[in-house]
Amino acid sequence: MTENNDIKMVIITGMSGAGKTVALQSFEDLGYFCVDNLPPMLLPKFIELMADSKGKMNKVALGIDLRGREFFEYLWGALDDLSERTWIIPHILFLDAKDSTLVTRYKETRRSHPLAPTGLPLKGIEAERGLLTDMKARANIVLDTSDLKPKELREKIVHLFSTETEQAFRVNVMSFGFKYGIPIDADLVFDVRFLPNPYYIPHMKPLTGLDEEVSSYVLKFNETHKFLEKLTDLITFMLPHYKREGKSQLVIAIGCTGGQHRSVTLTEYLGKHLKPEYSVHVSHRDVEKRKGH
């Protein structure tokens, strides 16, 4: 097995209704390989898979439900086994909340508590709390989510488990051609087909917006300058608000007919404009699809 001190594993457990789903989504946003409801008896096998992954699973978050006493025997054994391995140090994140808060959440979602499927949720909560006493005592971090909104819980997890780089709000700016379809992962789409098209100038037809002659042509028009002024003003206004709402990244797509000239030029411009303030990735989805045709 490989020795790798960079492997991180977080076991997420705690009271049902305390926010495990939000927690797993938060770890997923941080680039963790996430598995929900992993039976504790499978944990040793999963650890072996991590060891053999050659770095492909160097950050893992596992959501584990402990709804039967027999599960604890498997979990304690697996955790004791982990303590003997130098290449991985597990962290246990225990999510808790007040009984009254958990009851309210179950009423709002109209779901039954897993330990009281036909009874009152409070009975199930009390039973689960008793089962999880030792688990809570062994946890590295206990988070009380009673007064936390989902966005606030996510912010806490990001603060606790991410590096400064991982906390950075990422902006992806891409060009595309409408004839090939709008990118399905785009958050914001801008249509620049109203701008003069270099495609109809014969010697520019095989070029792209990455070529200086094309970009200079597109950027020389007054309407281009006015549009870029309004676009950068709008994006600069919106980005801090998206970040405040808890988004980890935003995809901005700029499209022209074929994704060769106008959209490429403006995508490059916007990317350079945003880079001093944000972590920006610029890409051109369709730039090779009909180049030279």
Curated annotation (Swiss-Prot):
InterPro entries: P-loop_NTPase (IPR027417), RapZ-like (IPR005337), RapZ-like_N (IPR053930), RapZ_C (IPR053931). ATP binds at residues 14-21. Gene3D superfamilies: P-loop containing nucleotide triphosphate hydrolases. GTP binds at residues 65-68. GO terms for molecular function: ATP binding; GTP binding. Belongs to the RapZ-like family. Displays ATPase and GTPase activities. This is Nucleotide-binding protein BcerKBAB4_4948.
